[in-house]
A protein has these predicted regions:
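Active-site neighborhood of divalent metal-dependent phosphoester/pyrophosphate hydrolases
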Residues: 91-93
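Divalent metal-coordination and catalytic microenvironments
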Residues: 86, 108, 123, 136, ...
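Intrinsic-disorder/low-complexity accessory segments
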Residues: 1-83, 157-219, 224-766
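Short, solvent-exposed loop/turn and secondary-structure capping segments
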Residues: 96-102, 120, 139, 145-151, ...
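Extended hydrophobic secondary-structure segments that form protein cores and membrane-embedded regions
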Residues: 83-89
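Acidic/histidine-rich helix-loop elements
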Residues: 105
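Aromatic/His-enriched, Gly/Pro-containing loop or helix-boundary segments
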Residues: 21, 49, 108-121
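Active-site-proximal loop/hinge segments that shape catalytic or ion-binding/gating pockets
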Residues: 115-120, 124-185
Length: 766
């Protein structure tokens, strides 16, 4: 008859209230569950109670503890109130082959901000186009049956106070219906509701102190629901407890209950999302405590305690006093933009994510620089300002929390390596806006980018200095070398680390890639050495085929580091081999394997980065307590430390104390920033090693998660060694304490790998 019935928990019985108090524990007692002030008025705790003796979701005597009503949903009316976008499976190949990862070897639920994979590009574009008021994604497995909203810390680009109007109630609507309509899993948890604990101590004001000991946070927008929240969407990840018929019923009824709640409150949902967009269009300041500010609590749940950390305001002379600037200026001309490829890619990324783009039609000046017509301007006066700012802002350095679920890095200008200027002065923005044309959507930007091509200045018909600044520049050099063309690497001067080629060869690649070139007469060409041949790269850590089931399961499932490296090499245009004996360069974030080790010992150059690669060299203790010896270097000569076991990453200023072609292009470009996942450094290096990179202890990092109480926190920040080179006993090594290819996002670090590849083929060490 077009109607669906489901049971809904509506309240607690007397026994239920007593059991709730017992399971939450005495107020103020160490380990008891505390009710967060910010959700005390919206959280009902219906569905919280676990079965006797259980700490996971299981069977509960619902009738004993809850009052229950049967709700009837008229499906036709529901569909007249709301419509549904249903994506049965984002990861089609993963579903086919029973792997969490995609065929590319990526966890797609860590790629929604970076959007390096086709699957996430498609999903995020769908969200951006439809602007759903609510989004729910089902995952597994968390045996407690977990439904969001997340606990803090929260991503600062969320307009969280408006999202919070329905986050808790919508999450509970799903959880309540799910657990009340299946036979096996009758309780669920919500991080924001259930994960705050009493410490047993008193706060300074005499109140019982509380603490988020193990946050399930939404600081990272790499997860699909958290990405959706940037679009004003009330969004959830649901972590089911198992894969079986009971859970299938729970998911179906959970969605029904949540859908009924959304239909009942659809005008309020639409109004809240409209207010989010209104804040964007007016670039309103929503930092106040009573708005977003209160949601930036510290680890001890003091509301607003970290508002200034998470939402610092532009408070200089003439600036807007807002967390959001007025606009970002991204040049698209060769004089002002060192990385044309990444800048053009950013225009496509932003517009694909429903950020509207402006392009100047006349020249304008800002902060003493004249920008020509054709300069990209990303205005924050638009509905999707949170999406734009979430991608382009520098980020937050978090030190006061014990753990995060994933790194929060975006900072595209820094991690992808293009030049960008931030404007926070309203008066200057008005001048910039007046120079621009109409707003451009994705289709407009794609058409426009067809005419954003390589930049060339100077003498034609002689030599060309090809700037070493991007994946495209590396791929172009590889294309020339693989075609048998001569390419030199510049050894010194302002262009050290860039390339020298013939003008005719430049012409053969400048239309295929977005490059920057400067023509010079042969007599004026800078000193260079010819790269003797095209590099051949061996990537350490490729697993053998699986013996049963899908033969590539071992490759695509769990071999994250290998797949990051593999896709990075594809972007850079390197020839990759599975026969290490043919390699001129061995690379890897994974541990150096047997074949790679043999190649390095026989003369191939090696660049290793991150904890696994370095541990294979230094030696380590395995899970069983066995001491595994290192390789290449003598025991104890290289020591890698980390800030703490839970620390993750840093985008930090660095110095380059040693002249080397491995770092030369960064020095020439004035690139003083290094991103690395791992929060590591070298506390001891082998005799004869050269320090390539140190952290700049005089400057604060821009972004990162570094536990302030970590054993080596101060050591890490105190000019710590981040990278070394070592040429001795026939070895040619470059070793980095942290990652260079993590999740394919940190592309500004790719050139360390390519510089090693090319410089090792110059006939000496440079």
């Amino acid at each position: 008859d077009g109607k669906l019935d489901y049971d809904r928990l509506t309240g607690f019985t007397a026994e239920g209230e007593a059991e709730l108090a017992a399971q939450m524990g005495p107020v103020g007692a160490e380990g008891s569950v505390a009710v967060p002030d910010l959700v005390a008025d919206t959280a009902t705790y219906l569905g919280y109670l676990k079965g006797e003796g259980l700490n996971v979701s299981g069977v509960v005597d619902l009738a004993k503890y809850y009052t229950i009503e049967t709700e009837t949903v008229d499906v036709d009316k529901l569909l007249s109130d709301v419509f549904f976008l249903i994506v049965p499976e984002e990861n089609v190949e993963g579903r086919t082959y029973l792997t969490r990862t995609s065929s590319g070897g990526f966890d797609l639920n860590r790629d929604n901000s970076f959007q390096t994979q086709a699957e996430t590009q498609n999903m995020t574009q769908l969200i951006a186009a439809w602007n759903p008021v609510s989004f729910t994604e089902f995952h597994g497995r968390v045996k407690q049956f977990q439904c969001e909203p997340c606990d803090p810390p929260h991503e600062p680009n969320f307009e969280y106070d408006l999202l919070a109007e329905h986050l808790m109630a919508g999450g509970e609507a799903l959880g309540i219906a799910a657990v009340a309509n299946n036979d096996g899993y009758n309780s669920y948890v919500i991080p924001q509701r259930d994960y705050l604990s009493y410490t047993g101590a008193k706060a300074a004001d005499g109140a019982d102190q509380t603490c988020w000991y193990d946050p399930w946070d939404d600081m990272s927008t790499s997860y699909t629901p958290q990405y959706a929240m940037l679009h004003g969407t009330v969004a959830y990840t649901v972590e089911v407890p198992a894969y079986n018929d009971d859970v299938a019923a729970a998911v179906a009824y959970g969605q029904l209950g949540q859908s009924a709640y959304i239909a009942e409150n659809k005008q309020e949902y639409l109004l809240a999302q409209t207010k989010i967009f209104e804040r964007g269009v007016t670039n309103a300041n929503s930092d106040a405590y009573e708005l977003v500010g209160q949601w930036f609590c510290d680890q001890y749940d003091v509301e607003g305690a970290e508002a200034e950390l998470f939402r610092p305001e532009y408070d200089g002379a003439g600036q807007n006093g807002n967390f959001y600037p007025e606009c970002y200026i991204i040049p698209l001309d060769g004089a002002n933009q060192s990385n044309l490829q990444a800048a053009a890619d950013m225009m496509e990324w932003l517009s694909r994510n429903d950020v509207k783009i402006l392009v100047s039609e006349t020249a304008f000046s800002y902060s003493g620089v004249r920008y020509p017509a054709g300069t990209m301007v990303v205005s924050l006066y638009q509905a999707k300002r949170s999406v734009a700012n979430g991608a382009l802002y520098d980020g937050t350095v978090i030190t006061g929390w014990p753990v995060l679920y994933s790194e929060g890095i975006t900072a595209f200008a820094k991690t992808r390596g293009f030049d960008m200027v931030t404007c926070a002065e309203p008066a200057a923005y008005r001048t910039i806006r007046a120079a621009c044309g109409d707003w451009m959507d994705h289709a407009d930007c794609v058409r426009y980018l067809a005419n954003v091509t390589s930049s060339f200045t100077g003498v034609e018909g002689a030599k060309v200095i090809l700037s070493n600044a991007s994946e495209d520049s590396t791929a172009a050099v590889n294309a020339l070398l693989q075609a048998g063309k001569g390419v030199g690497m510049i050894l010194s001067g302002e262009q050290a680390g860039s390339f020298l080629c013939d003008y005719s060869d430049w012409r053969s690649v400048c239309t295929q890639y977005r490059l920057s070139g400067a023509g010079v007469a042969e007599a004026d060409a800078p000193l260079s050495l010819t790269i003797t041949k095209a590099p051949v790269v061996y990537i350490s850590g490729k697993p053998s085929d699986s013996r049963t089931g899908f033969v590539k399961t071992s490759l695509v499932s769990g071999s994250y580091q290998y797949n990051y490296d593999r896709q990075a090499m594809e972007l850079l245009g390197f020839q990759v081999t599975d026969d290490a004996s043919l390699a001129t360069l061995v690379i890897g974030a994974a541990a150096l394997d047997e074949a790679g080790l043999a190649a390095v010992e026989n003369g191939a150059a090696y660049i290793g980065y991150g904890s696994n690669a370095i541990s294979a060299i230094t030696g380590y203790t395995d899970r069983r307590g066995n001491q595994i010896p290192g390789c290449l270097l003598s025991t104890g000569s290289l020591v890698r430390e980390t800030v703490s076991s839970e620390s993750m990453d840093a985008l930090a200023y660095v110095t380059y104390p040693t002249q080397s072609l491995i770092t030369a292009s960064y020095v020439s470009e004035g690139d003083e920033l290094l991103y690395g996942y791992g929060a590591g450094y070298f506390s001891a290096i082998p005799e004869g090693a050269q320090v390539l990179i140190r952290l700049d202890g005089a400057r604060e990092p821009l972004e990162g998660f570094l536990v302030g109480g970590g054993e080596h926190y101060d050591d890490f920040l105190d000019n710590s060694i981040q990278a070394i080179s070592y040429q001795k006993d026939g070895l040619n090594l470059a070793l980095f304490a942290n990652t260079l290819t993590n999740k394919l996002h940190q592309r500004d670090e790719f050139n360390f790998i390519s510089n090693m590849a090319f410089s090792s083929l110059l006939g000496g060490v440079y």
